[in-house]
Amino acid sequence: MALEATAKSVNFPKRAYVTFLAGAGDYVKGVVGLAKGLRKAKSAYPLVVAMLPDVPEEHRCILESQGCILREIEPLSPPENHTAKFAMAYYVINYSKLRIWEFEEYDKLIYLDGDIQVFGNIDHLFDLPDGYFYAVMDCFCENCPERVQWPAELGSPPPLYFNAGMFVYEPKLSTYHDILETVKVTPPTLFAEQVILI
């Protein structure tokens, strides 16, 4: 029986959802909501939580009780040339999110920010053709100026690009190293790692 299970796991590509978590704050509640949403939508795939060492044991226990796979990652600091002020100070920890490209035990992953709510099954996104990076276009304030204005203190709005809160990708160490090299030569932006990925 064990051999049969092993053979089956070899025949089927390994897929999972992945999210990022750092610190002892309330963000864990969003990740719990994400895990519950994926279960309610009857997703066939697990949720991997890429987390920094500062996530407390209490939060880890909560996530494990929700069926999450916990994967501790080391913090990744921005390079010295990225000392600019970010739109939000906590964006600096988001460079660590780039480590999810190291998760080569999976063939394909769907990254979801921990504060995303899943209302329907999105497993079909795993079936998109391999070899591509899939993401959704970011929605900037100028798309709905009657509701939200781009803050003048942030300067000109950035060019159109995707939102790094949801994307489909294939983890590879070579891609991870290419991203790190790109970070070194890319001027810093207000949105930390998000612009690096475009």
Where are these regions (language model features)?
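Glycosyltransferase catalytic domains, chiefly GT-A lineage
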Residues: M1-I198
